[in-house]
Design a protein with these regions (language model features):
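Beta1/beta-strand and adjacent pyrophosphate-binding region of the FAD-binding site
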Residues: 2-16
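Conserved N-terminal/central alpha/beta ligand/cofactor-binding core
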Residues: 5, 22-126, 141, 153-173, ...
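Short hydrophobic core segments
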Residues: 11, 144-155
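An anion/pyrophosphate-binding glycine-rich loop and adjacent beta-alpha core
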Residues: 37-39, 55, 184-321, 418-491, ...
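Conserved beta-strand-loop-beta-strand element in the redox core of flavoprotein oxidoreductases
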Residues: 128-144
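A glycine-rich dinucleotide-binding beta-alpha-beta segment and adjacent secondary-structure elements
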Residues: 307-373, 401-414, 537-591, 596
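Internal hydrophobic alpha-helix adjacent to the cofactor/substrate pocket in enzyme cavities
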Residues: 379-400
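Extended, charge-enriched "interface" segments that sit outside catalytic cores
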Residues: 431, 437, 448-615, 619-622
Length: 623
C-alpha cells in the first residue's frame, strides 16, 4: 500500500501540521500528511481569530517565510484590527476575526494545490524507531509507512480527556477520538511526558441574543492585512463583534456548580493556560471583581453560530446555561454546545534541539501543543520551522534556526528549548528583548531573504520586499537631506505645541519630535511633491515614519543584539562534560548537561545558570 519511502511524514493536520506539511512539500521533498479526518484540517478548535498581541507578529513572520497562515487569514477574515495602535510600533499587533468554516476549507484547498504532498486518513498508533533513528509510523490498521523524518503535531489528541462537570470521556476535541499509542512509544524510547489542560467556551445561537444590550466592537476604518504578498487585499466590508459583561448574579450562579467542577473537586490535576483562565477560575482568583468582559464573536459570514470569548468553562452544562442566561443580552440564549476542558499529553520541550528535532531520536520533530505551547499562531510557527528543518535534513542541508533578534518565532523556540515550560506557553511582546527590531511591519525585511535562500519564499516575494526596502530607505534619506524653512514649519509646530525653530532645519529632525506625525509632514509642499513624483504608497510612508521616529531605539537594540551575537558565535561541543568544571555550580552542571545548549548565548538563558557560571564556561572555551 505504501511501498515507497517518504522523505517526511507529518502526523496531525492542525495549524502546526498544516504548516509543516506545506513547508516540507514546498521545499521539494516527498511529504505525507496523516490525519484522523481529512474533513477537519486546520480546525479553529477554540476562538475564530488569528493574530493578536505578539501573535499577529508571528503570523506576519510565518507569511514572510513563505508559510500559508497569513494568506489564508486574509482570505477568510471578517474583521481586521490593529491592536495597541495608541502605543509605539513595537507593540502594534494585527488581528483578524475569521470565518471558521472558510478558514479550514481554504487551508485544505491550498494544501491540495501544493506539489509533493500526499494525504492519508487514519489514526497513527505508534512510531517505528530503529537504532535511535525514526524510520516511520504505524497506523491503527497496522499499516507501516516508512520515512526519513517524522514531524509530530498531535495537538490536544494524545490521550485526550474531555471534562464537562462530573462527566469525562476520551477525546481530542469535541466529537473526535483521542490518539493512543504514541505517548507510550515515546516514553518507552526514553522521553519524559507530562499533562496539560486547556478549555473552550460554549457556542451559542446568535439569533437568540439581544445585541442592543451590548457594546458594538467594529473593525478598523482602514483595515490592513497579514500577508506581504499581493495575493490578498484588505477587507472591503467587515462584521462587528460585541462586548458584554458578567455580573455578581452570574458569579453566584457559577459558584453553585463548584462542587461538581472537575477543577475544584480534584479530577483535573493538569495546569491550564495562565493568560486564558476559565470563567470559574477567574471568579475564584479575582473574587473582588464585580464583572468580567465577554467578547461575543461571530463564527463567520454565513453562520449564526457565536463564540463567547471569556467564558471558557468545564462546569456542568446546566450551570453554564443558567449563568449565561443571566448575562446582559443573553437572557434568551440557545446553546449549540457547552464549553469543556481537555487534558492531554505533552513532552517538555527541553528534550528538543533548536531545529525542533528531538535529542533522543534522530529525524523525529515535535511542533505545537505537544511542546507545551497554546495558540494557533505559536503552533503554526513551530510547524513551519519543523517542516523546514525536517526537509533540510533530508536534503542534507544546514538547518534554519532563527535567533532571538531575528523573529518572535526565534524567541518562542529558544524559550521552549532553554527554559522549558510546565504550563501552556503563549507569546507576549514582553518575552522579546528586541521587540523594536521585531515589529509586525518589517517581518519581510527580517526573514524573506533567509527563506528565499533555502528555496521556500518565492522570487516574487523577494523582489517585492527589496522594492519596499529600497523605497522606504529612499524616503528616509529624503527626510535626512531635505530642509524645511522657518515660515513653513513654525505654524505646524505651534499648532502641535512643539518648540518653534529660529532657522531652517532638516525634516528628519522635525519628524523625530514626538508631537509631529506623518499627517503633519504631509502638509509640507516638498513632501507632497516627493510622494506624488515617486508614487509613494501608505505602506512606504508608515515604514519611513517608524524608521525616523524610532531610529534611536532601533540602533540601541541593534547594538545590544550584536553583543549577543558574539556569544552565539561561541559554540559548545555536543558532548561536552560540564562536570569536569570544578568552579561551576552543581545546579548549572545539572541543567547544562540535561539541556545541552549549542552556544554560550543559549547556556546563559537557562534557568539556574548564573552569570558567574557563564564566565567560567567562557574561560573554559578559551574566550
Amino acid at each position: 500500500m505504501f511501498e515507497d519511502l517518504y522523505d517526511v511524514i507529518v502526523v496531525g493536520a492542525g495549524h502546526a501540521g498544516s504548516e509543516a506539511a506545506a513547508a516540507s512539500a514546498n521545499l521539494g521533498v516527498k511529504t505525507l500528511l496523516v490525519t484522523m479526518s481529512l474533513q477537519n484540517i486546520a480546525q479553529m478548535s477554540c476562538n475564530p481569530a488569528m493574530g493578536g498581541i505578539a501573535k499577529g507578529q508571528i503570523v506576519r513572520e510565518i507569511d514572510a517565510l513563505g508559510g500559508y497562515s497569513g494568506i489564508i487569514s486574509d482570505k477568510t477574515a471578517i474583521q481586521f484590527k490593529m491592536l495597541n495602535k495608541s502605543k509605539g510600533p513595537a507593540m502594534w499587533s494585527p488581528r483578524v476575526q475569521s470565518d471558521r468554516m472558510r478558514f479550514a476549507e481554504e487551508w485544505r484547498l491550498m494544501l491540495e494545490r501544493t506539489p509533493n504532498l500526499d494525504f492519508y486518513q487514519e489514526m497513527v498508533r505508534g512510531l517505528i524507531i530503529e537504532d535511535g533513528k525514526i524510520k516511520g509510523i504505524r497506523t491503527s490498521l497496522g499499516v507501516e509507512i516508512r520515512a526519513k523524518a517524522v514531524v509530530l503535531t498531535n495537538g490536544t489528541f494524545l490521550n485526550g480527556l474531555i471534562h464537562i462537570g462530573e462527566k469525562q470521556f476520551g477525546g481530542g476535541r469535541a466529537g473526535e477520538s483521542a490518539a493512543y499509542g504514541i505517548t507510550e512509544d515515546l516514553v518507552s524510547a526514553g522521553f519524559e511526558a507530562g499533562r496539560m489542560k486547556t478549555g473552550t467556551p460554549p457556542r451559542v445561537d446568535g439569533r437568540s441574543l439581544d445585541y442592543l444590550k451590548m457594546n458594538e466592537e467594529k473593525g478598523d476604518t482602514r483595515p490592513d492585512k497579514f500577508s506581504y504578498s499581493d495575493e490578498t487585499k484588505p477587507l472591503s466590508r467587515q462584521k462587528s463583534c460585541h462586548m458584554t459583561y458578567t455580573s455578581l448574579d452570574v458569579h453566584d450562579i457559577l459558584r453553585e456548580g463548584f462542587d461538581r467542577s472537575p477543577m475544584f473537586n480534584g479530577r483535573i490535576q493538569s495546569i491550564g493556560p495562565r493568560y486564558c483562565p476559565s470563567i470559574e477560575d477567574k471568579i475564584n482568583r479575582f473574587a473582588d471583581k464585580e464583572r468580567h468582559q465577554l467578547f461575543v464573536e461571530p463564527e463567520g459570514w454565513d453562520t449564526v453560530e457565536v463564540y463567547v470569548n471569556g467564558f471558557s468553562t468545564s462546569l456542568p452544562e446546566d450551570i453554564q446555561f443558567k449563568a449565561l442566561r443571566s448575562v446582559a443580552g443573553f437572557e434568551k440564549v440557545k446553546f449549540f454546545r457547552p464549553g469543556y476542558a481537555i487534558e492531554y499529553d505533552y513532552f517538555p520541550p527541553t528534550q528538543l534541539k533548536h531545529t525542533l528535532e528531538t535529542k533522543l531520536v534522530e529525524g523525529l520533530y515535535f511542533a505545537g501543543q505537544i511542546n507545551g505551547t497554546t495558540g494557533y499562531e505559536e503552533a503554526a510557527s513551530q510547524g513551519l520551522m519543523a517542516g523546514i528543518n525536517a526537509a533540510l535534513k533530508v536534503k542534507e542541508q544546514e538547518p534554519m534556526i532563527l535567533k532571538r533578534d531575528e523573529a518572535y518565532i526565534g524567541v518562542l523556540i529558544d524559550d521552549l528549548i532553554t527554559k522549558g515550560t510546565d504550563e501552556p506557553y503563549r507569546m507576549f511582546t514582553s518575552r522579546a528583548e528586541y521587540r523594536t527590531l521585531l515589529r509586525q511591519d518589517n517581518a519581510d525585511f527580517r526573514l524573506t531573504p533567509q527563506s528565499h535562500a533555502i528555496g521556500l519564499a518565492s522570487e516574487k516575494r523577494l523582489r517585492r520586499m527589496e522594492k519596499k526596502l529600497t523605497e522606504s530607505e529612499k524616503m528616509v534619506a529624503f527626510f535626512r537631506e531635505t530642509s524645511v524653512s522657518v515660515a513653513d514649519v513654525n505654524p505646524v509646530l505651534e499648532e502641535k505645541g512643539s518648540a518653534l525653530i529660529s532657522q531652517s532645519d532638516k525634516m528628519f529632525k522635525i519628524f523625530s519630535r514626538p508631537q509631529i506625525d506623518l499627517a503633519d509632514m504631509l502638509k509640507f509642499e516638498k513632501v507632497k511633491e516627493y510622494v506624488a513624483l515617486n508614487e509613494v504608497d501608505q505602506e512606504i510612508l508608515e515604514q519611513a515614519e517608524i524608521q525616523v521616529k524610532y531610529s534611536g531605539y532601533i540602533e540601541k537594540e541593534r547594538n545590544n543584539a550584536d553583543k549577543l551575537t558574539r556569544l552565539e558565535d561561541v559554540k559548545i561541543p555536543e558532548f561536552f562534560d560540564y562536570h569536569k568544571i570544578k568552579s561551576m555550580s552543581i545546579e548549572a552542571k545539572q541543567k547544562l548537561s540535561a539541556i545541552r545548549p549549542v552556544t554560550i548565548s543559549q547556556a546563559s538563558r537557562i534557568s539556574g545558570v548564573s552569570p558567574s557560571d557563564v564566565s567560567v564556561l567562557l574561560i573554559y572555551m578559551g574566550r
